[in-house]
Amino acid sequence: MAEIPDGLLYSEEHEWVRGDVSPGATVTVGITEYAAEALGDVVYVEPPSVGDEVRAGDVCGELESTKAVSELYSPVTGTVTEVNGQLENAPDMVNSDAYGDGWIFKVELSEGNEDLLDADAYGEKTE
Amino acid sequence: MSTAETPALRSPLHEEHVSLGATMTEFAGWDMPLRYSGDVAEHTAVRTAAGLYDLSHMGELMVTGPDAAAALDYALVGHMSRMRLWAAKYTMMCDANGGIVDDLVVYRRDWDHFMVVANASNRIEVARELAARFDAGGFDAAVSDETAALALIAVQGPAAAAIVGSLCAAGEAEPAGLKYYSAANLLLEGGHHAFVARTGYTGEDGFELFVGADVAADVWRSALAAGASHGLIPCGLASRDSLRLEAGMPLYGHELSADTTPFDAGLGRVVAFEGPAVVLSSSQPGAAAPGAGLSDQVDPRAVSVERGAFVGREALARVADQAPGKVLVGLVGDGRRSPRAGYAVTDEDGRQVGIVTSGIPSPTLGQPIAMAYVPPTLAEVGTEVGIDVRGRREPMRVVALPFYKRQA
């Protein structure tokens, strides 16, 4: 079973969010272990660029495995402040450490997001 | 995400996959392993050591009867009656328009007994077509779908011969002595009988073991145990697809379809228009049939006749000497974003001129690779084309197939 840690928030599109989701705060975003397992070995991550304005629910990048390609959705609205450059050479960290070193980008929120799920609610979605 | 009303078919090895923790997927109506550990690890194991596959979804159609060889000569585009005993042959069934109904591997198990291995997605249609064509041609031959009674277990990779050898009972012929695309009945440790063929779909050396469904789990576990010290791991259909694509092998529904002739796919060599056929004379039944073994002698009851009519012959003869309207090519890109099946091949002005049939980031090459149909003017090796990869044009160039060839 894929791990779904408490203390993170989750989107319907299988992204996780770490941090306070109120305007002005900066959060870290990645994809869940469930999504990583479904995708298979990730061989390429195309994150958004630093400075991009992203909107909750919109496509902002893509992830590619040998088997499939998946769009990356932003779970929050704001400005991208940082992307995980380690994924350039080690995209498989998305599989091996989805909630840690496999983080994808950080966003400074311009608005809050009330629609994200807690671990229990997200867990129900993946059953 | 199956919405089909009929439940997915299960391999005799289903419980083995569940206990190994496989990620399962619905494939052509079957619930089959997609992966166990990881796609790239499984792909690499087959290239460098060995992988174990459950291919029990493939269709096994037994064709028997005095006219079996002549019946297949008529029903398929290849010249089955010329096959030696225990040989395997890659061939196709085409429709009257020359369109491909399925690509097949046919094994000659006896002079009057062939096993036709069909893709899971086409099994029922191929069985029905074979029976209809035998009937239409007035042949004394029968088709029996044995898929449910058999399991197909493949051991693929450079260590395959050693592993399959260790599965065989003491004193049995060494599988390593089998030629590529030939087969034998072998007795395995534990007393299980297996029809073992040196065939595969990965671009590596390998064997396919057809065994009874009732002993499949035993053979599977033996192979896992015997292969462990050789680096063998269980592998799923995801790695089978990436391996076959690197090896430039076509997949029905992607490179091959009813809208495609063997000539379009660059496989015109499978169509035999001419040549003497050696068929059993049905007027002399009952001669002693050769027993199991690696024999390739000609049956004493055989008579020689010229290659005659076969379904699709006229249509295929018309296109055989024409310049094809489309050509199947290999493409390699230097970027990282990979084309996928269905993406448009574009010219310099961004107009669609072709279509990608399969595409992946190649685990062995570390670059995106694809097969695509393009106009003959863009088919020369070295030609630069563009692929519309999810809204952005990615440059790729035509290369000779296969992308990967094992060292001899």
Language model: regions and residue ranges:
Chain A
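Short, Lys/Arg- and Gly-enriched loop/turn segments at beta-strand edges
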Residues: 64-73, 90-93
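Short, charged beta-turn/beta-strand-edge "cap" motif at the junction between a beta-strand
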Residues: 60-61, 66-67, 86-87, 111
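Short, charged/polar surface micro-motifs in flexible loops or helix N-caps
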Residues: 37, 77-80, 86-87
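Conserved hydrophobic positions within beta-strands
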Residues: 14-17, 63, 72, 77-80
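Acidic, low-complexity mobile loops and tails
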Residues: 1-59, 92, 96-127
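A short beta-strand motif that forms part of the nucleic acid-binding face
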Residues: 33, 67, 76
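Residue-level recognition of beta-strand microenvironments
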Residues: 17-20, 66, 83-86
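Charged, alpha-helix-enriched surfaces in structured cytosolic catalytic cores
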Residues: 75, 89, 117
